[in-house]
């Protein structure tokens, strides 16, 4: 595939056009896939025709390879790994993937230490693949400009990511006890947003979990409820928001339809209509999403 040197500027966004060997012209764009979202394993993939990042590797390598093959993607085209935090459902395969494919792993120093100590990560990250990032300090990695930001959660450390690429913005906020002031800005600047809607408080309180675990989930460093997620969207989403995906739903304390309806109801109370003002979907826990074109 050859890059045409001419760049077309429209609405102040640079679009790079490609021509393949069949003479077909295609627009370079960002795409998104979720390979799993929940306590069974999390992994999110952002990619263009020439670059890519994988955020979290809590899904098994064999499973990831199968998903890549099913979507006609090359596993060898993964270029960078970013990690949100050191819980097993986000990092259990990060060492294996980094070692087997010689991939750099970006996260905070504390998360790197947590990964090193995590017994669930059987193969550790080689020192030359360890890349330390700082919260609120943007970095340029290939075609991506990425800003990590602090996320309150009871892990060693935790970050979300605000990604800028190909003229669009994408934000990931997961495993979050409460929405911080810094997140307000990133939600407001997002064209595409993945945000946690972990549980129904009613289902959690009536469920079989021991009280200490309920308190942990409901605490300021636990997980975001459906209601809190809906309130964050209603309060801070801007007209530039195009698509929202609800992520990390609890299998025991939530249902996809309940999460979506709860968020939709809160949005309607503020005059925001899902499906009209922006698209709203729920990411599946154990199976991949479709491929989304972020334009």
Which residue stretches match the model-derived regions?
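Conserved beta-strand hairpin/beta-sheet module of binuclear metal-dependent hydrolase folds
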Residues: 17-71, 159-175, 192
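Active-site metal-binding motif and surrounding structural segment of the metallo-beta-lactamase
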Residues: 61-108
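Metallo-beta-lactamase
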Residues: 109-159, 165-167
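Cap/insert and terminal regions of metallo-dependent hydrolase folds
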Residues: 181-281
């Amino acid at each position: 595939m050859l890059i045409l040197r001419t760049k077309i500027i429209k609405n102040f966004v640079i679009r790079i056009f490609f021509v393949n060997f069949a003479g077909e012209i295609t627009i370079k764009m960002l795409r998104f896939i979720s390979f799993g979202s929940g306590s069974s394993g999390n992994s999110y993939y952002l990619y263009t025709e020439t670059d890519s990042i994988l955020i979290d590797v809590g899904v098994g390598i064999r499973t990831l390879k199968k998903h890549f093959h099913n979507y006609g993607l090359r596993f060898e085209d993964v270029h960078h790994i970013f990690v949100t935090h050191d819980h097993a459902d986000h990092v259990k395969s990060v060492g294996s993937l980094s070692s087997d494919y010689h991939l750099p792993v970006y996260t905070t120093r504390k998360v790197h230490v947590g990964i090193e100590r995590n017994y669930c990560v059987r193969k550790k990250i080689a020192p030359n693949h360890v890349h330390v990032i700082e919260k609120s300090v943007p970095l340029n990695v290939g075609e991506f400009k990425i800003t990590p930001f602090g996320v309150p959660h009871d892990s060693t450390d935790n970050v979300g990511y605000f990604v800028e690429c190909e003229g669009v913005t994408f934000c990931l906020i997961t495993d979050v006890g409460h929405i911080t002031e810094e997140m307000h800005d990133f939600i407001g600047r997002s064209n595409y947003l993945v945000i946690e809607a972990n549980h129904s408080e009613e289902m959690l309180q009536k469920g079989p979990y021991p009280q200490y675990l309920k308190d942990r989930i409901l605490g300021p460093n636990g997980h975001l409820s459906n209601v809190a997620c809906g309130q964050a969207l209603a309060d801070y989403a801007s007209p530039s928001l195009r698509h929202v995906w609800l992520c990390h739903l609890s299998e025991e304390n939530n249902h996809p339809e309940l999460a979506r309806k709860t968020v939709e109801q809160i949005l309607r109370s503020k005059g925001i209509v899902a499906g009209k003002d922006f698209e709203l979907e729920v990411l599946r826990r154990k199976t991949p999403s479709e491929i989304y074109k972020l334009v």
